[in-house]
Amino acid sequence: MTLDKAGIKRSFAAASDTYDSVAELQRTVGRELLQAIDTTHLTGTLLDLGCGTGFLTGELLARSRYETMIALDIALPMLQATQSKLADKRNINYVCADAEHLPLGGQCIDGVLSNLALQWCRNLDAVFTDIKRVLKPEGQLVFSTFGPQTLHELKSAWATVDHHSHVNEFYSETQLKHFLLQAGFKNSQVKSTVYISRYQSVWTLMQELKHLGAQHVVAGRNKKITTKTAMQKMITAYEKHKVSDQVPATFEVISVIAKV
């Protein structure tokens, strides 16, 4: 998958002040991710990979029996927001780094957790291999990521306008299972859940995506300014999905529990 990593970093850095106000789905998914595991068994050194503004980090601090927590994010303003939010907590290391290049030694982490962040990695197969490298024997990887049904309404609406890529592509359950197996993970539990969010308008959805930092970041996309005519054509096509004067947006979330 070809992603513009510099663009991703800029987008999330710019969204650090607005992220929490629109991240309800992210919080819901994070809670459900932790409910699927026995958090009291999360001990030792834990890594929140792609911590964003620190919601999952905070939940892990409250629920687990951690000794050391590492909060890692590619966008420094996001990491600073987490640090500010958790200023009264101890034994937390804040690391500004790319999840695809973990600055960690081998077999130093007991558990890696990640909530709706790994979809922004170019090569998940390499990411899983590196995660396995840093995990201790019997360590586990617990994460959620978006699946291919995500924003299919927006994708189909843009398809009526042109043939350019306007919506990010996401890996399927089958692809994720393959990558995990190739990386050496066993007994992976994979679950797909579809969430439908509803918005007053297509513009409201677009603004939420911007405030989340989740704009279109596929490298090689059409970088020309979208005309008003093209945008209106997309909106007209999208509004055909309207139900009770609201436009739906599908988010497929794939949750995974994998052990070394």
Regions found by a protein language model. Give the residues of each.
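Class I SAM-dependent methyltransferase Rossmann-like catalytic core
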Residues: 2-31
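Conserved alpha-helix/loop element of class I SAM-dependent methyltransferases that forms part
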Residues: 24-44, 59
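Class I SAM-dependent methyltransferase SAM/SAH-binding core
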Residues: 47-101
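Conserved Class I S-adenosyl-L-methionine
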Residues: 53-55, 189-260
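A short acidic, Gly/Pro-enriched loop at the edge of an enzyme's catalytic core
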Residues: 100-111
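A short SAM/SAH-binding and catalytic strip from SAM-dependent methyltransferases
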Residues: 110-123
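A short glycine-rich, Lys/Arg-flanked "PGG" loop and its adjoining helix->strand segment in the class I
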Residues: 125-137
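Conserved catalytic/acceptor-binding region of the Class I
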Residues: 138-202, 212-224
